[in-house]
Amino acid sequence: IGRPSTYSKIMERISETGYVRTVGRALVPTWYAFSAIKLLKEHFASLIDLEFTSQLEARLDDVARGLCDQQTLLREFYFGTQAQTNGLQELLRCAINDADGANINCHRIGTHPTTGEGINVHVGPFGPYVRSGDTNRRIAKFMAPDEMTVDRATAMLDAPGGGAWKPQ
């Protein structure tokens, strides 16, 4: 699902905002991307539903062909309709009241094999870090989320000192 005319602009935007980084010709998601996806799944599931996006694409095509008024489409999207009362305005109101930033920015990795405590990656204002109990370590910028395993997190947490962990 996606409009070909907006593809390059979307790719540019997600790179600019830090949701992905470029490695060679590949776009690799960052921890910020995982937080954004978690927020969307938990609070805006209807907007990322495949059927909804497909129907919206069809309506956008109708606007492009002059078969539907763009103001009507925007009004219905934002305020909802009589058949479907929850528009974006209501979704945003609920998300503002219900969203827990600490939960959205926390990603479970596993359990520390020695202490039995949970190991989580948190996305904070200064970047991602791994945490277990009272110990945390910054995650190096070059480390992709799929490289964060329980073994790697344990090595980082058990290493002496602070700062970002760097591989040997």
Q: Where in this protein do the model-derived segments appear?
A:
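Basic, low-complexity terminal or inter-domain segments flanking catalytic cores
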Residues: I1-Q168
